[in-house]
């Protein structure tokens, strides 16, 4: 599949063809914030949608989530909070995700048709943000991958504190980092 499968399924569901597409939004992941759209990706997208579509690239994974949320808003002003397992690289001494500052919790302000990053949390190397912590809980209860966090979210309403009790799911380590028990 890749994006081609999603694109064609979406066009089929809407009953449109590629020539009806004016703008394509592309979002980076696991790349440095501020990176340029890779030319191979631009070429691949243009092959599917044609030359008429304008390509808009968002190198920040979290900014991409924020724009998707804003697209659903009817409000003039909003605080958009993105809580994710991990997004794009903010800063990396080694050039990869290992030991890098990575987007995990980002706050954006939407005002006057402008999206502005206000702050970030949990982005230092080794820190565990809310999304990553949730994925660790997902693994702790027996799911095989952090990709199963959505299944875990679906089970949340069925939880019963009297059955679960006070199981210590996490604690703070000597270095001040959260970790699973």
Predicted segments with their positions:
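Short acidic/glycine-rich loops and adjacent helix/strand connectors
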Residues: 1-181
């Amino acid at each position: 599949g890749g994006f081609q499968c999603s694109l064609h399924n979406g066009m089929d569901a809407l009953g449109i063809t590629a020539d009806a597409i004016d703008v394509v939004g592309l979002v980076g992941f696991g790349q440095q914030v501020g990176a340029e759209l890779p030319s191979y990706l631009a070429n691949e997208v243009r092959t599917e949608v044609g030359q008429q579509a304008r390509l808009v690239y968002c190198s920040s994974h979290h900014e991409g989530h924020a724009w998707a949320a804003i697209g659903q808003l009817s409000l003039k002003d909003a605080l958009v909070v993105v809580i994710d397992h991990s997004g794009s690289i903010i800063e990396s001494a080694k050039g990869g995700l290992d030991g890098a500052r990575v987007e995990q919790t980002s706050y954006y302000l939407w005002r006057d048709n402008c999206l502005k990053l206000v702050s970030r949390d949990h982005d230092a190397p080794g820190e565990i943000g809310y999304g990553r912590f949730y994925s660790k809980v997902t693994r702790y209860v027996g799911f095989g991958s952090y990709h199963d966090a959505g299944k875990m979210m679906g089970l949340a309403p069925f939880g019963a504190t009297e059955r679960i009790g006070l199981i210590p799911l996490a604690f703070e380590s000597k270095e001040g980092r959260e970790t699973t028990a």
